[in-house]
Curated annotation (Swiss-Prot):
Keyword Cell cycle attributed: no
Assigned protein family: Belongs to the bacterial ribosomal protein bL9 family.
Protein name: Large ribosomal subunit protein bL9
One MF annotation (Gene Ontology) recorded for this entry: rRNA binding
InterPro entries tied to this protein: Ribosomal_bL9 (IPR000244), Ribosomal_bL9/RNase_H1_N (IPR009027), Ribosomal_bL9_bac/chp (IPR020594), Ribosomal_bL9_C (IPR020069), Ribosomal_bL9_C_sf (IPR036791), Ribosomal_bL9_N (IPR020070), Ribosomal_bL9_N_sf (IPR036935)
Annotated PROSITE patterns: RIBOSOMAL_L9
Naturally occurring in which organism (per UniProt): Fervidobacterium nodosum (strain ATCC 35602 / DSM 5306 / Rt17-B1)
Gene3D superfamilies in alphabetical order: Ribosomal protein L9, C-terminal domain (3.10.430.100), Ribosomal protein L9, N-terminal domain (3.40.5.10)
Functional summary from the UniProt entry: Binds to the 23S rRNA.
KW NADP (keyword) present: no
Alphabetical keyword list: Ribonucleoprotein, Ribosomal protein, RNA-binding, rRNA-binding
GO annotation, cellular component aspect: ribonucleoprotein complex; ribosome
GO biological process, one term: translation
A Pfam family assignment: Ribosomal_L9_N
């Protein structure tokens, strides 16, 4: 029996896939538990429509992320922090600190999960920080750490 998976099912398939399952398995397990629906022409048509909508949504998300990345490239984000002699910071700067500065500079919400730091920043200077935005868009931004007077 052909069924369309409504949810990811381990060792069987991912959401939206059309699979062949034995009649008993489909009728007694998958369909009653809400894991799958029978693959009728109407269901297949609806599945195609949902895939198209998801594709359009992902394209819009990618376009929005590319615009945000180009806006990020226009700025050098300056962060003031207390530092001792030799330029070492008292403490460190994390992705949360950087996202706060970006949010204030751009007047937009910027999630700290989008910033990829291998290690926290612990010294004064200019750094290239990797950002991974939704939609698979990534790039580097400039962050300058200055001494707080």
């Amino acid at each position: 029996m052909k069924v369309v998976l409504i949810q990811d099912v381990p060792k069987l398939g991912k959401k939206g896939e059309v699979i062949n399952a034995s009649d008993g398995y489909a009728r007694n397990f998958l369909i009653p538990r809400g894991l799958a629906r029978e693959a009728t022409p109407e269901v297949l048509k609806q599945l195609e429509k949902e895939k198209e909508e998801e594709k359009k949504r992902l394209e819009a998300l990618k376009r929005e992320s590319e615009n945000l990345l180009s806006e990020l490239h226009k700025h050098v984000f300056k962060i003031k922090a207390k530092a001792g002699d030799g330029g070492k910071l008292f403490g460190s700067l994390t992705s949360a600190n950087i996202s706060d500065v970006i949010s204030k500079t751009l007047s937009k919400e910027f999630d700290k999960k989008w910033i990829v730091l291998d290690n926290p920043i612990k010294a004064l200077g200019t750094y290239d920080v990797t950002v991974k935005l939704p939609g698979g868009v990534s790039g580097k931004i400039k962050v300058e750490v200055l001494r707080e007077e």
